[in-house]
Amino acid sequence: MSWLDQITWTDDGLVPVIAQEWQSNDVLMFAWMNREALALTAQRGEAVYWSRSRGRLWHKGEESGHVQRVHEIRIDCDADVVLLKVEQLGHQPGIACHTGRHSCFFQLLKDGAWQSVEPVLKDPSSIYK
């Protein structure tokens, strides 16, 4: 049995993936992978995801230059979630979110309202052309 066969895939053939910064342990983003994306990620050492909105493979950083170098690939106890320990690279290292922030998890629930608690490191309009 292949290591890919040991993953518990959804009915759509996907697995949820959390990208975590390998040095700080900050959670950077959540995404999905299909079998091909996970195999390519392991082969290339860079994160490749499945974009559900585009219906295609998405090499992280293909447009922005903010590539994720993969240091470790882990699965949880049920083999139904993948954890990537990554180094977030790019023209301005540390940007993982398409909003120009370090993490996609920049909104904090406080007093019944969502508040942005991380700064924009680079204007997204200058990242995506």
Curated annotation (Swiss-Prot):
Principal location: cytoplasm
GO cellular component: cytoplasm
Cofactor note: Binds 1 Mg(2+) ion per subunit. Binds 1 zinc ion per subunit.
Reaction equation(s) it catalyzes: 1-(5-phospho-beta-D-ribosyl)-5'-AMP + H2O = 1-(5-phospho-beta-D-ribosyl)-5-[(5-phospho-beta-D-ribosylamino)methylideneamino]imidazole-4-carboxamide
GO molecular function: magnesium ion binding; phosphoribosyl-AMP cyclohydrolase activity; zinc ion binding
Biological processes per GO annotation: L-histidine biosynthetic process
Localization in the cell: Cytoplasm
Pfam families, sorted: PRA-CH (PF01502)
Residues reported in the UniProt entry to bind Mg(2+): 76, 78, 80
Keyword Nucleus: no
Superkingdom as given in the UniProt entry: Bacteria
Cofactor(s) for this UniProt protein: Mg(2+); Zn(2+)
EC numbers: 3.5.4.19
Record key words, sorted: Amino-acid biosynthesis, Cytoplasm, Histidine biosynthesis, Hydrolase, Magnesium, Metal-binding, Zinc
Pathway info: Amino-acid biosynthesis; L-histidine biosynthesis; L-histidine from 5-phospho-alpha-D-ribose 1-diphosphate: step 3/9
Sequence positions that bind Zn(2+): 77, 97, 104
Gene3D superfamilies per UniProt: Phosphoribosyl-AMP cyclohydrolase (3.10.20.810)
Top-level class of the enzyme under EC nomenclature: hydrolase
Role summary: Catalyzes the hydrolysis of the adenine ring of phosphoribosyl-AMP.
HAMAP family: HisI
Quaternary context: Homodimer.
Family note: Belongs to the PRA-CH family.
Protein name, per record: Phosphoribosyl-AMP cyclohydrolase
Provenance organism: Leptothrix cholodnii (strain ATCC 51168 / LMG 8142 / SP-6) (Leptothrix discophora (strain SP-6))
